[in-house]
């Protein structure tokens, strides 16, 4: 399916210059002179190269259609992750790099979606939101309530995020995996 250059979104898988690329970041730019364009940072899923490309609204790219299949995360073996197909119980080993920044949020027994291109796994999608425990949270500074103040906190997986002042150590919260932001209290 062809899409316009300005319709590219993070997470899209596109075909570009003979390769399969995953869009990591986009930035819409409207210069004072000339036409608007989309600055796209993407990673080649076959060899791991990264590149930045400008797409104008007149440019079109082929959006790759992927098959998705549910797998369950079993365990980690070095830098390999072992998943099990929930239908056939077949196990598959994948490189932990496929998860990118979402890697710390992978939990034992978690159901994930493997994205397959020509029956080869190219991406692992975790649930959008997961629960995590706060193991360390800074104290609230009195008088900091004039603006919507957030404070730094550390999750049980080692990731640092900003949380509201009322969140303390030991609190279970919901976190957006891909934005790595606080969503709310769990439960």
UniProtKB/Swiss-Prot annotation:
Pathway: Protein biosynthesis; polypeptide chain elongation. GO terms for biological process: peptide biosynthetic process. Its main location: cytoplasm. Transmembrane segments: none annotated. It is found in: Cytoplasm. It comes from the Bacteria. Keywords: Cytoplasm, Elongation factor, Protein biosynthesis. CDD domains: S1_EF-P_repeat_1 (cd04470), S1_EF-P_repeat_2 (cd05794). PROSITE patterns: EFP (PS01275). The keyword Cytoplasm applies. GO terms for cellular component: cytoplasm. Belongs to the elongation factor P family. Involved in peptide bond synthesis. Stimulates efficient translation and peptide-bond synthesis on native or reconstituted 70S ribosomes in vitro. Probably functions indirectly by altering the affinity of the ribosome for aminoacyl-tRNA, thus increasing their reactivity as acceptors for peptidyl transferase. This is Elongation factor P. It comes from Erythrobacter litoralis (strain HTCC2594). The lineage of its organism: Bacteria, Pseudomonadati, Pseudomonadota, Alphaproteobacteria, Sphingomonadales.
